[in-house]
Amino acid sequence: MALKNFNPITPSLRELVQVDKTSLWKGRPLKSLTKGISKTGGRNNQGRITSWHRGGGHKKLYRIIDFKRNKIDISAIVERIEYDPNRTAFIALIKYEDGEYSYILAPQKLSVGNRVISSQDADIKIGNCLPLKCIPIGTTLHNVEMQVGKGGQIARSAGTSVDLVGKDSGYAQIKLRSGEFRLVPLDCKATIGSISNPDQKNINLGKAGRNRWLGWRPHVRGVAMNPVDHPHGGGEGKTSGGRHPVTPWGFPTKGKKTRKNKRTSKFIVKKRK
């Protein structure tokens, strides 16, 4: 996929850079693999804001993605590559030999007409899904499981991948894009290749309104608030906050480590950079 620039006939087009989607499917998604999705506006079941600056946005249909790849030893053909508004990666509609359809994350270089399969004996080919114990060291992977049978959780965003760097004592060692080295059980599945749409990181939305279409509201600075709303708020005239940066609840921010899950720390061989 290439990037698309525009002639500046309006101010919002001057800086706009988008991913060229001309090669993607232009019709509607497969109805049997979609469902409605409710907007939360960043609120939880008590109505309290748990994710700031969310709300509005274009109505979407959720595409049901197969992260587990549980149809073993049944080959499938790629019918089309589609845009998915719910994620940065593209998705592929595949049709199995028994007639069943499914959506999977589309890796780079997967094209219409290609065949994919989930099997222990599958070839090391783009889009095929295998247990880590059957994949040679040095292979680039995506959609990697962390628990057997739970479905892929690692490397699902546009352009991402992990590298298989070792196997030992029932675990595979994978290297993440962040520089972290992590242990994953050898029976966990992973898919060959890198995720599609690597140019996603280079886009420029061009105007605030386009962010609103995506469901993002304005990010208000703490120093622009009142004292009741934020520790940085208040003061006579414009102030700098008067203290080290903190969250609305007073905890240090901008670099302070916040990871709490010590239970899984034993699976991290080397921390991220």
Curated annotation (Swiss-Prot):
GO terms for biological process: translation. Keywords: Ribonucleoprotein, Ribosomal protein, RNA-binding, rRNA-binding. GO terms for cellular component: large ribosomal subunit. SUPFAM superfamilies: Nucleic acid-binding proteins, Translation proteins SH3-like domain. Belongs to the universal ribosomal protein uL2 family. Pfam families: Ribosomal_L2, Ribosomal_L2_C. Gene3D superfamilies: 2.30.30.30, Nucleic acid-binding proteins, Ribosomal protein L2, domain 3. PANTHER family: LARGE RIBOSOMAL SUBUNIT PROTEIN UL2M, RIBOSOMAL PROTEIN L2. GO terms for molecular function: rRNA binding; structural constituent of ribosome; transferase activity. InterPro entries: NA-bd_OB-fold, Rib_uL2_dom2, Ribosomal_uL2, Ribosomal_uL2_bac/org-type, Ribosomal_uL2_C, Ribosomal_uL2_CS, Ribosomal_uL2_dom3, Ribosomal_uL2_RNA-bd_dom. SMART domains: Ribosomal_L2, Ribosomal_L2_C. One of the primary rRNA binding proteins. Required for association of the 30S and 50S subunits to form the 70S ribosome, for tRNA binding and peptide bond formation. It has been suggested to have peptidyltransferase activity; this is somewhat controversial. Makes several contacts with the 16S rRNA in the 70S ribosome. Residues 228-273 are annotated as: Disordered. Part of the 50S ribosomal subunit. Forms a bridge to the 30S subunit in the 70S ribosome. Residues 254-273 have a biased composition (Basic residues). This is Large ribosomal subunit protein uL2.
